[in-house]
């Protein structure tokens, strides 16, 4: 099949959240299944120097009253085709925000539609979040192009209908109060990025006022869990890690822990319990819970906490104050640094994700891959990927709590601290976490089944049987399922 993915991000070149990981990593797995998969993204300023871009555009057109050109490039790691929509509105490296954000992405969606109609016509046009939400509306009456719409984060819903009508063409048949609603109505299939999130968004608590619509379209809604690139994220080969390690030589992790402690200004002591967090510092990620429990945790235990990220000013200020009050025990770097993030994954003992909501989450997968035990709230994709630690039966991969309350989070932290003191049991827990299988293999097979379904390909796919062989997060080493 010919499949075109349209999105605002594509890792590793241009990435803010999980969408970038999906758009960057899903195509290689689909290509291995025999499909012609390409990606189209806005031509942000830095991409022209990061990628080898064609000298001449492959397509020119006019939409929304302005000219644009599409250039051809190759993904720097996986070598599949990427198309860049060239226009002055994308010259900045800023992806989101700004006064013209609504116009920029509506224009990108319109340019993508023109490109798909007139240059490279896919059988499936796979759209991601509201930025491409008008594409399913425009493609609704085209029998040759089927559309799939992926919800990465329901909270961001795009411009309202009245604003869209001032910017672009809204077909006579279009319904929906805003871009996100219209996309879900008119896409041939809709998926969320985890099975649990697909169920949650049909409820009032997580539906962001769209739960009625989501229940209405539930027949075409499903959840497909994200994966990670196991070659890119491999602690045995990661060039950033000072000490490489695997399940067979976990003792090497201690060197990373000491270097992490030194780099973040913590007391260098491998026996201390080191908690890490790499996150946008926003309410969604539960940073306010961390602020509420940190002082009590540091008073009661000998724990250390290392935080990396940027976000809301008041949360940054709270974390900064904790670092001032607890030198050597609490450290925060208010930036994003890929090398330091990998060191946190590969050197911390446990990883914090006390999220209010979490459509899928990638960080917990990376943490487990690198032997850092996730401490998570049981919500969204965290339910599907982290199994509660049961020391009596030696099963589970992390520590979980249900209510978004400080006492629940604090209890999980203390339980994990106590478990860390039992070194043999903790090492088995690390090995179970590291052996979980979260590659893109299963996700790609599930997307393939959905693509064939939406295109009306009725013959049995051999890949359907393959899907049944895998369960989310199954152990890559059967001997470690119950150690």
Swiss-Prot record:
Enzyme category, top tier: transferase
Residue numbers binding ADP-alpha-D-glucose: 15
Entry annotated with the keyword Glycosyltransferase: yes
Assigned keywords, A-Z: Glycogen biosynthesis, Glycosyltransferase, Transferase
Signal peptide: none
CDD domains for this protein: GT5_Glycogen_synthase_DULL1-like (cd03791)
Pathway per the UniProt entry: Glycan biosynthesis; glycogen biosynthesis
Residue stretches spanning the membrane: none
GO biological process assignments: glycogen biosynthetic process
EC number of this enzyme: 2.4.1.21
Catalysed reactions, as listed in the record: [(1->4)-alpha-D-glucosyl](n) + ADP-alpha-D-glucose = [(1->4)-alpha-D-glucosyl](n+1) + ADP + H(+)
GO molecular function: alpha-1,4-glucan glucosyltransferase (ADP-glucose donor) activity; alpha-1,4-glucan glucosyltransferase (UDP-glucose donor) activity
Domain of life according to the entry: Bacteria
Family, as annotated: Belongs to the glycosyltransferase 1 family. Bacterial/plant glycogen synthase subfamily.
Its job: Synthesizes alpha-1,4-glucan chains using ADP-glucose.
Matching HAMAP family: Glycogen_synth
UniProt xrefs under PANTHER family: ALPHA AMYLASE DOMAIN-CONTAINING PROTEIN, GRANULE-BOUND STARCH SYNTHASE 1, CHLOROPLASTIC/AMYLOPLASTIC
Protein name: Glycogen synthase
Organism for this UniProt entry: Prochlorococcus marinus (strain AS9601)
Lineage, uppermost ranks: Bacteria, Bacillati, Cyanobacteriota, Cyanophyceae, Synechococcales
Gene: glgA
């Amino acid at each position: 099949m010919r499949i075109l993915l349209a999105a605002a991000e594509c890792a590793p070149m241009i990435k803010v959240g999980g969408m970038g990981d999906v758009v960057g990593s899903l195509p290689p797995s689909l290509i291995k299944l025999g499909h012609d998969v390409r990606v189209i993204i806005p031509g942000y300023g830095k991409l022209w120097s990061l990628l080898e871009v064609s000298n001449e555009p492959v397509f020119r057109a006019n939409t929304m009253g302005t000219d644009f050109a599409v250039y051809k490039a190759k993904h720097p790691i996986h070598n599949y085709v990427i198309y860049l929509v060239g226009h002055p509105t994308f010259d900045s490296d800023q992806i989101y925000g700004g006064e013209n954000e609504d116009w920029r992405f509506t224009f990108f969606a319109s340019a993508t539609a023109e490109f798909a109609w007139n240059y490279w016509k896919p059988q499936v046009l796979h759209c991601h979040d509201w930025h491409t939400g008008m594409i399913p509306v425009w493609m609704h009456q085209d029998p040759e192009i089927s559309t799939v719409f992926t919800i990465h984060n329901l909270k961001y819903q795009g411009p309202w209908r009245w604003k869209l009508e001032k910017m672009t063409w809204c077909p006579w048949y279009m319904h929906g109060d805003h871009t996100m609603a219209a996309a879900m109505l008119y896409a041939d299939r809709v998926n969320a990025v985890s099975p649990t999130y697909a169920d949650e968004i049909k409820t009032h608590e997580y539906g962001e006022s769209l739960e009625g619509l989501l229940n209405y379209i539930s027949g075409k809604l499903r959840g497909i869990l994200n994966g990670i690139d196991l070659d890119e994220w491999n602690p045995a080969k990661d060039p950033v890690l000072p000490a490489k390690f695997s399940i067979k030589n976990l003792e090497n992790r201690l060197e990373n822990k000491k270097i992490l402690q030194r780099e973040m200004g913590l007391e260098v002591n491998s026996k201390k319990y080191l908690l890490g967090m790499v996150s946008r510092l926003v309410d969604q990620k539960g940073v306010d819970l961390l602020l509420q429990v940190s002082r009590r945790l540091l008073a009661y235990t000998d724990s250390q906490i290392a935080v990396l990220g940027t976000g809301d000013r008041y949360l940054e200020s709270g974390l900064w104050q904790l670092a001032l009050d607890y030198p050597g025990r609490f450290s925060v770097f208010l930036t994003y640094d890929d090398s330091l993030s990998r060191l946190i994954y590969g050197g911390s003992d446990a990883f914090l994700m006390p999220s209010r909501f979490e459509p899928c989450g990638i960080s917990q997968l990376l943490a487990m891959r690198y032997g850092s035990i996730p401490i998570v709230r049981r919500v969204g994709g965290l339910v599907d990927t982290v199994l509660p630690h049961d020391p009596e039966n030696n099963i589970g991969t992390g520590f979980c709590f249900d209510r978004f309350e400080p006492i629940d989070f604090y209890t999980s932290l203390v339980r994990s601290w106590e478990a860390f003191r039992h070194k043999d049991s903790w090492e088995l827990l690390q090995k179970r976490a590291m052996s979980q299988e979260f590659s893109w293999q299963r996700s790609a097979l599930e997307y393939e089944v959905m693509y064939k379904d939406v295109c009306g390909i009725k013959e049995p796919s051999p890949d359907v049987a393959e899907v049944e062989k895998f369960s989310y997060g199954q152990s890559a080493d059967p001997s470690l399922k119950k150690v």
